[in-house]
């Protein structure tokens, strides 16, 4: 295979596979000898079913479905209490389904990862599904999804998000996340994303842009959302808050539209109002290193870690390069995972901004350079890779805190990107509108976030983690849903299981 232009034969391909296996083993042994953790691939097991007979499968299905519903029911008192406060503008004489029952149905729709209103009508109204669901919710009456859509069109859908924040607040109050905190702060990652786009304007709130279409341009209408999630070092990402872009929030006279930074200010205000006393650390991407954002964080008494890109804040970069020569003790080397890391920081950098430089912020800047070894994709050669990460911080760095602030906090900003990707590509249909009524569209979005919120503690719970590891997250949700649409459940067993004491414990 020395000639790159020649196709390898089967023998050479087989030989390369063997070489790659041996090289991989040698690399892992080397990393182990150096005290590095090469990590384990989180692939699902490739084996036949472990159930010996139908009885074993039934027991597993009953246990999984019931424990999933127990976790949901543990949240139900908070959900129902808050949902009951939402004003129902419908005519009471014509109401068949209560508001809270309709919204619980909407949450279940996303807990089971139903992909559309048509699928909800088709799948969630099947007699066997309803019979099984009534084992957990005896009074539930499944409506047509259009009924839910009409309700979402007329109620204050922002109150649905308030339900989500109330449920998160309850978990925080019960100290469910206390073991994952870093320096007793809750890390909130904030990131913007596009929900969907259309070529026609279907609501006046849509943002617009010009896109190329061959030799011409055309107007495209889109919906962007700024999301906030609680993120933790174990990878858990808890949906928290959403802020929609809105054409009316921009300057309509100058046609300067709403943007992510404006949405951040609105979201930050609501987040502070919802959690006024919570110790929060926000982690933000390279769009946010600017004075107004830091002002908002400091006004709210939030810690922050913000990605700093090469061309952002040139005066801060210049100050860093000058001061690092005088602060040679501000260096730290460590191993993390399979990587060698070198940290270098400068504290107390003055950042001047605003009209005539009248405003100033004192910030702290760190650079993390890291190297690691991995196998080349097309050979058995071991390559050395390198990367660099830069952040600015609210608090000064030291050898005692640089690992926590960078590796355990700032890097987990990626958790929200992973969480949004899960909602877009792994069952929650983030990019599906569900309705072309703006209010209803937002309502379905908030219900989706609530459904995701219910599922996250379930897949990290002690009672379900084994089956989640067996089937994967989507496989587990599909396993539960398949159980509920078939005659797997034994009513006396389920009733006894539901009657036992239950406490949510996370791994």
Residue ranges and their predicted role:
Residues 149-234, 241:
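Active-site-proximal, Lys/Arg-enriched surface segment
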Residues 105, 120, 144, 148, ...:
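Short, conserved catalytic/metal-binding motifs centered on acidic residues
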Residues 2-82, 491, 495-496:
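Charged, often Cys/His-bearing segments associated with DNA-binding zinc-finger transcription factors
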Residues 2, 67, 85-86, 125-128, ...:
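A short, flexible helix-boundary coil/loop motif
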Residues 73-104, 149:
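Basic, short loop/linker segments at the boundary and entry of helix-turn-helix/winged-helix-like folds
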Residues 212-279:
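Electropositive, glycine- and tryptophan-enriched low-complexity nucleic-acid-binding patches
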Residues 400-435:
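Short amphipathic alpha-helical "interface-anchor" segments enriched in bulky aromatics
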